[in-house]
């Protein structure tokens, strides 16, 4: 199966991805964006959820066959990680953005053995900053990180640089280029909007400021 294409189409169909080149969204980072991606919506659609489950499992079996444990990145990576771990009959843990301020004050939740080989699961990759913080926490906890998988990446150069500098490989089911290709082919956006969509991807921080 061509997961790159099918996942892009599924995200468009269920409106997990919305494209508004003329009416940009405002991200939490302050960036203006012609695209908004909420992969949490895939959990509400069994067909999409199962497609993503099968695709992520395939990524692990293809690229990280030595995987011994799944680690979800809070919060959106947790349900995806749980679904994969259940499908593969593997243990699972998850990583908080910061330690709890009560109880055991855990940053990593779950119980596995130090030194185990882990694949980290994210739902969406933008700059990679928060994802790589989770990786760093796991490495400091004594675990071996095989790599990271995710549903979708915007394909920013800064993300590619961040993962390269961290020495972490990343594999996602779909990406911005494929999504825009399918969006045009299926009339979610018009051909004359492609230039705007391309300009944003090249310089997202300064687009339409």
Swiss-Prot record:
Orotate binds at residue 126. Belongs to the purine/pyrimidine phosphoribosyltransferase family. PyrE subfamily. The keyword Transferase applies. Pathway: Pyrimidine metabolism; UMP biosynthesis via de novo pathway; UMP from orotate: step 1/2. It catalyses: orotidine 5'-phosphate + diphosphate = orotate + 5-phospho-alpha-D-ribose 1-diphosphate. Catalyzes the transfer of a ribosyl phosphate group from 5-phosphoribose 1-diphosphate to orotate, leading to the formation of orotidine monophosphate (OMP). PANTHER family: OROTATE PHOSPHORIBOSYLTRANSFERASE, URIDINE 5'-MONOPHOSPHATE SYNTHASE. It is an enzyme of class 2 (transferase). 5-phospho-alpha-D-ribose 1-diphosphate binds at residues 96, 100, 102, 122-130. GO terms for biological process: 'de novo' UMP biosynthetic process; pyrimidine nucleobase biosynthetic process. It comes from the Bacteria. GO terms for molecular function: magnesium ion binding; orotate phosphoribosyltransferase activity. Its cofactor is Mg(2+). Keywords: Glycosyltransferase, Magnesium, Pyrimidine biosynthesis, Transferase. Its EC number is 2.4.2.10. CDD domains: PRTases_typeI. InterPro entries: OPRT, Or_phspho_trans_dom, PRibTrfase_dom, PRTase-like. This is Orotate phosphoribosyltransferase. The keyword Glycosyltransferase applies. Homodimer.
